[in-house]
Amino acid sequence: MNVPFVIETTHRGERAYDLYSRLLKDRIIMLGTPVNDDVANIIVAQLLFLESEDPDKGINLYINSPGGSVTAGLAIYDTMQYVKCPVSTICVGQAASMGALLLLAGAKGKRYALPNSRIMIHQPLGGAQGQATDIDIQAKEILRLRSYINGLIVKHTGHTIERIEKDTERDYFMSAEDARQYGLIDEVVEKQRVIAPTPAPAK
Protein backbone atom coordinates (compact mmCIF):
# COMPACT_ATOMS: atom_id res chain seq x y z
CA MET A 1 0.00 0.00 0.00
CA ASN A 2 1.33 3.42 -0.94
CA VAL A 3 1.59 5.83 1.99
CA PRO A 4 0.02 9.22 1.19
CA PHE A 5 2.01 12.42 1.57
CA VAL A 6 0.88 15.70 3.08
CA ILE A 7 2.21 19.16 2.27
CA GLU A 8 2.96 21.50 5.16
CA THR A 9 3.62 25.19 4.60
CA THR A 10 5.84 27.10 7.02
CA HIS A 11 7.81 30.34 6.93
CA ARG A 12 10.58 28.28 5.34
CA GLY A 13 8.38 27.16 2.49
CA GLU A 14 6.61 23.91 1.69
CA ARG A 15 7.67 20.51 2.94
CA ALA A 16 6.27 17.08 2.10
CA TYR A 17 5.86 14.43 4.78
CA ASP A 18 4.63 10.89 4.48
CA LEU A 19 1.48 10.67 6.60
CA TYR A 20 3.02 8.56 9.37
CA SER A 21 5.95 10.95 9.79
CA ARG A 22 3.56 13.88 10.02
CA LEU A 23 1.53 12.11 12.69
CA LEU A 24 4.75 11.35 14.57
CA LYS A 25 5.37 15.10 14.85
CA ASP A 26 2.18 15.24 16.90
CA ARG A 27 3.34 12.25 19.00
CA ILE A 28 0.93 9.87 17.29
CA ILE A 29 1.99 6.32 16.39
CA MET A 30 -0.21 4.13 14.18
CA LEU A 31 -0.16 0.34 14.35
CA GLY A 32 -2.35 -0.61 11.41
CA THR A 33 -0.88 -3.94 10.32
CA PRO A 34 -0.25 -7.43 11.66
CA VAL A 35 2.53 -7.46 14.25
CA ASN A 36 5.85 -8.81 12.99
CA ASP A 37 9.52 -8.12 13.70
CA ASP A 38 9.80 -5.31 11.12
CA VAL A 39 6.69 -3.55 12.40
CA ALA A 40 7.81 -3.99 16.01
CA ASN A 41 11.21 -2.46 15.29
CA ILE A 42 9.55 0.60 13.76
CA ILE A 43 7.10 1.03 16.67
CA VAL A 44 9.88 0.56 19.24
CA ALA A 45 12.07 3.11 17.44
CA GLN A 46 9.20 5.62 17.33
CA LEU A 47 8.52 5.21 21.05
CA LEU A 48 12.19 5.71 21.90
CA PHE A 49 12.45 8.71 19.58
CA LEU A 50 9.44 10.44 21.12
CA GLU A 51 10.78 9.80 24.61
CA SER A 52 14.11 11.37 23.63
CA GLU A 53 12.26 14.37 22.19
CA ASP A 54 10.26 15.00 25.38
CA PRO A 55 10.18 12.40 28.18
CA ASP A 56 7.46 14.34 30.02
CA LYS A 57 4.88 14.41 27.24
CA GLY A 58 2.41 11.66 26.42
CA ILE A 59 2.24 9.47 23.31
CA ASN A 60 -0.90 8.27 21.51
CA LEU A 61 -0.72 4.75 20.03
CA TYR A 62 -3.60 3.98 17.65
CA ILE A 63 -4.19 0.26 17.10
CA ASN A 64 -5.99 -1.46 14.23
CA SER A 65 -4.32 -4.85 14.16
CA PRO A 66 -5.27 -8.54 13.99
CA GLY A 67 -2.24 -9.41 16.12
CA GLY A 68 0.72 -11.49 15.03
CA SER A 69 4.09 -12.55 16.39
CA VAL A 70 4.20 -12.99 20.15
CA THR A 71 7.87 -12.06 20.48
CA ALA A 72 7.44 -8.97 18.28
CA GLY A 73 4.37 -7.92 20.26
CA LEU A 74 6.19 -8.35 23.55
CA ALA A 75 9.02 -6.15 22.26
CA ILE A 76 6.49 -3.35 21.76
CA TYR A 77 4.82 -4.11 25.11
CA ASP A 78 8.11 -3.96 27.01
CA THR A 79 9.09 -0.68 25.35
CA MET A 80 5.71 0.86 26.24
CA GLN A 81 6.40 0.02 29.88
CA TYR A 82 10.05 1.11 29.61
CA VAL A 83 9.64 4.65 28.29
CA LYS A 84 8.94 7.44 30.77
CA CYS A 85 6.17 8.94 28.62
CA PRO A 86 2.63 7.79 29.42
CA VAL A 87 1.36 5.88 26.38
CA SER A 88 -2.35 6.24 25.60
CA THR A 89 -3.77 3.40 23.52
CA ILE A 90 -6.76 3.82 21.20
CA CYS A 91 -8.41 0.94 19.33
CA VAL A 92 -9.82 1.83 15.92
CA GLY A 93 -11.31 -1.09 14.00
CA GLN A 94 -9.89 -4.06 15.83
CA ALA A 95 -7.32 -5.09 18.39
CA ALA A 96 -7.00 -8.86 18.37
CA SER A 97 -4.52 -11.26 19.94
CA MET A 98 -1.24 -9.33 20.44
CA GLY A 99 -3.08 -6.21 19.31
CA ALA A 100 -5.37 -6.60 22.33
CA LEU A 101 -2.39 -7.06 24.64
CA LEU A 102 -0.90 -3.79 23.39
CA LEU A 103 -4.25 -2.05 23.82
CA LEU A 104 -4.57 -3.04 27.48
CA ALA A 105 -0.89 -2.16 28.09
CA GLY A 106 -1.56 1.57 27.82
CA ALA A 107 -1.19 3.90 30.79
CA LYS A 108 -3.83 3.37 33.46
CA GLY A 109 -6.85 5.54 32.72
CA LYS A 110 -5.66 6.16 29.14
CA ARG A 111 -6.83 3.02 27.32
CA TYR A 112 -9.60 3.76 24.85
CA ALA A 113 -11.64 2.27 22.03
CA LEU A 114 -13.86 3.89 19.44
CA PRO A 115 -17.51 2.76 19.59
CA ASN A 116 -17.44 0.25 16.72
CA SER A 117 -14.14 -1.36 17.62
CA ARG A 118 -13.77 -5.09 18.17
CA ILE A 119 -11.35 -6.60 20.67
CA MET A 120 -10.36 -10.27 20.89
CA ILE A 121 -8.16 -12.21 23.29
CA HIS A 122 -7.06 -15.83 22.98
CA GLN A 123 -4.17 -18.14 23.75
CA PRO A 124 -1.00 -17.96 21.61
CA LEU A 125 -1.15 -19.92 18.38
CA GLY A 126 1.68 -22.14 17.27
CA GLY A 127 2.57 -25.14 15.17
CA ALA A 128 5.24 -27.70 15.91
CA GLN A 129 7.16 -29.82 13.43
CA GLY A 130 10.33 -31.85 13.24
CA GLN A 131 11.60 -34.61 15.49
CA ALA A 132 9.61 -35.66 18.55
CA THR A 133 12.09 -33.92 20.86
CA ASP A 134 11.77 -30.67 18.89
CA ILE A 135 7.98 -30.87 18.99
CA ASP A 136 8.10 -31.35 22.76
CA ILE A 137 10.39 -28.32 23.19
CA GLN A 138 8.15 -26.13 21.03
CA ALA A 139 5.01 -27.29 22.85
CA LYS A 140 6.55 -26.40 26.22
CA GLU A 141 7.50 -22.96 24.92
CA ILE A 142 3.95 -22.31 23.69
CA LEU A 143 2.60 -23.28 27.12
CA ARG A 144 5.15 -20.98 28.79
CA LEU A 145 4.12 -18.07 26.58
CA ARG A 146 0.46 -18.78 27.21
CA SER A 147 1.02 -18.68 30.97
CA TYR A 148 3.10 -15.51 30.71
CA ILE A 149 0.63 -13.61 28.52
CA ASN A 150 -2.29 -14.67 30.71
CA GLY A 151 -0.34 -13.25 33.65
CA LEU A 152 -0.01 -9.91 31.85
CA ILE A 153 -3.76 -9.83 31.18
CA VAL A 154 -4.37 -10.54 34.88
CA LYS A 155 -2.00 -7.70 35.80
CA HIS A 156 -3.77 -5.13 33.62
CA THR A 157 -7.39 -6.21 34.18
CA GLY A 158 -7.45 -7.41 37.77
CA HIS A 159 -9.24 -10.66 36.89
CA THR A 160 -8.24 -13.99 38.40
CA ILE A 161 -5.89 -16.25 36.48
CA GLU A 162 -8.63 -18.88 36.43
CA ARG A 163 -10.99 -16.58 34.56
CA ILE A 164 -8.35 -15.47 32.07
CA GLU A 165 -7.32 -19.06 31.36
CA LYS A 166 -10.96 -19.96 30.72
CA ASP A 167 -11.69 -16.91 28.55
CA THR A 168 -8.55 -17.29 26.41
CA GLU A 169 -9.06 -21.01 25.79
CA ARG A 170 -10.83 -20.02 22.56
CA ASP A 171 -11.25 -16.75 20.65
CA TYR A 172 -13.04 -14.34 23.01
CA PHE A 173 -14.57 -11.42 21.11
CA MET A 174 -15.76 -8.20 22.74
CA SER A 175 -17.37 -4.98 21.62
CA ALA A 176 -15.85 -1.73 22.81
CA GLU A 177 -18.31 -1.55 25.69
CA ASP A 178 -17.74 -5.22 26.56
CA ALA A 179 -13.99 -4.53 26.64
CA ARG A 180 -14.56 -1.60 29.00
CA GLN A 181 -16.59 -3.74 31.37
CA TYR A 182 -13.97 -6.49 31.15
CA GLY A 183 -11.18 -4.05 32.09
CA LEU A 184 -9.22 -4.16 28.84
CA ILE A 185 -9.89 -0.45 28.27
CA ASP A 186 -10.91 2.45 30.48
CA GLU A 187 -13.35 4.31 28.24
CA VAL A 188 -15.25 4.15 24.97
CA VAL A 189 -14.69 7.49 23.22
CA GLU A 190 -16.06 9.36 20.23
CA LYS A 191 -14.25 12.71 20.44
CA GLN A 192 -10.49 13.18 20.15
CA ARG A 193 -10.33 15.86 22.82
CA VAL A 194 -10.54 13.15 25.47
CA ILE A 195 -7.33 11.47 24.35
CA ALA A 196 -4.99 14.39 23.73
CA PRO A 197 -1.45 13.67 25.03
CA THR A 198 -0.91 14.84 28.59
CA PRO A 199 2.27 15.46 30.56
CA ALA A 200 3.84 12.50 32.32
CA PRO A 201 3.17 12.30 36.06
CA ALA A 202 5.95 13.39 38.38
CA LYS A 203 8.31 10.57 39.25
From Swiss-Prot:
Protein name per its UniProtKB record: ATP-dependent Clp protease proteolytic subunit 2
Listed HAMAP family: ClpP
CDD domains linked: S14_ClpP_2 (cd07017)
Encoding gene (name): clpP2
Keywords linked to the UniProt accession: Cytoplasm, Hydrolase, Protease, Serine protease
Domain of life: Bacteria
Pfam families noted in UniProt: CLP_protease
Oligomer and partners: Fourteen ClpP subunits assemble into 2 heptameric rings which stack back to back to give a disk-like structure with a central cavity, resembling the structure of eukaryotic proteasomes.
Localization, UniProt: Cytoplasm
GO MF term (any one): ATPase binding
Role of this protein: Cleaves peptides in various proteins in a process that requires ATP hydrolysis. Has a chymotrypsin-like activity. Plays a major role in the degradation of misfolded proteins.
GO CC, any one term: endopeptidase Clp complex
E.C. no: 3.4.21.92
Family: Belongs to the peptidase S14 family.
Active site: residue positions: S97, H122
Catalysed reactions listed for this entry: Hydrolysis of proteins to small peptides in the presence of ATP and magnesium. alpha-casein is the usual test substrate. In the absence of ATP, only oligopeptides shorter than five residues are hydrolyzed (such as succinyl-Leu-Tyr-|-NHMec, and Leu-Tyr-Leu-|-Tyr-Trp, in which cleavage of the -Tyr-|-Leu- and -Tyr-|-Trp bonds also occurs)
The organism of origin for this protein: Myxococcus xanthus (strain DK1622)
GO biological process: protein quality control for misfolded or incompletely synthesized proteins
